């Protein structure tokens, strides 16, 4: 555990002149920042060999005129260098408090300090109400703060009510451990109303979440997201703009759709020992509604306005296909190697599934070649990018979609690449498969149910839910629609993204939850069966590969 009393920073300068004291900065970089950042949940470099920590920039945030002491905070940009030569940048707001404040938790204190004879503590400024108040003030008034390196520009969005610009606000830090930090702002007599996310890991581009949420709020009628209320952007003198934070409207919710689906599955499984197969009508209604909301989101993101080039639809170009293929083939090779290295650790069912997957390599390669060469007239657009049940909040009888940052392991540039919206659909279908598989393989509710019967009813449940969701989605999109040429392309592209998603999931399960490896492997098997159906139905098929159903899947019982 990090100990803030292990160091003490002393400076003859005032806190406002911190950056002029090179000895103090050096102490921060060598003694304070390394252990502190390694204690933070949002720091992603814990497992890497760290070479150095450097205060790259420190942007000044003046406090309001009525603040009592220490007239500003610093938005510090910390550069972390690694032994392999790579670097990352992190946002660390710093404030100096001259007396103990009970609302500042131990994890928010970096070190004791003495500035210009004044003792106190350097703290993560999110825990200092003066800093939170200054952020809100600058954002709602759309301030621009000139810095030594560029400027901080505060944008206000349509989601911020005009009456709240000069309102009295309260604030707190949301006590969640995640890759970012969350601040909540309340308006007197209205309760907590706004949610500000500070991005800790920074990228040299505008965050895709801000682009997507602001576009949906400002340019469309899709209101099933927390509305965009503003953002904080560092406009560099040279280089791309860097997004530091985004504020949205707060949304009251009961829980997310992953938990809701778990509850629905519990109700379903309680009846299974009595040989009853019963899915409540309200479950189908919820799934249909989510399919419609997904379709409405994609229709809102489908934008033909020539002035909005960042959101203009694009075709399936050769360049895009090669990007997807190269990424998938690299992923596939890594997953094969992981399975080989960990094969003996898998249970018998997982071993059988893994064996079929590896023996189907040539057929998968042929499917990839089909994706490379097949004429495709469907279009690509900006999408959610990390779409699953956990990203959908249940609000009474409706849904709110959150977290548009994209795949965590992808670069910012990759997160902005346009895909078929079926990539999102595939993510949600895989999420439903995970929900039922989690109950199938690791839940106390299913402990007394005969395994083969449980397998059959679980697969029936999943297929009913999948088809209900997909039918509602496609009905909402409408036919014909420029996004999808026809049902044949829909089916083919959905298989492409389902296979990519399941292979992606496989790596996490092998590394962290070996008992769950069978879940993505089962998803891969489902795609392989569908690919085989396409091959059987194709009268022009001239591949020398044997039909998989003739031997492989029949000879290896699941």
Residue ranges and their predicted role:
Residues 389:
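Catalytic-loop Lys-Pro-X-Asn motif of eukaryotic-like protein kinases
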Residues 49-68, 77-79, 173, 231-232:
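Short amphipathic beta-strand and strand-loop transition segments with alternating hydrophobic
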Residues 456-484, 492-557:
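ATP/Mg2+ or Mg2+-diphosphate-binding catalytic cores
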Residues 73-337, 395-402, 407-459, 463-467:
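Conserved ATP-binding subdomain of kinase catalytic cores across diverse folds
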Residues 9-52:
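Short Lys/Arg-enriched alpha/beta "domain-start" segment
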Residues 386:
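Conserved catalytic-loop position in the HRD/HxD motif
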Residues 158-169, 334-381:
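An alpha-helical support segment within catalytic cores of ATP-dependent transferases
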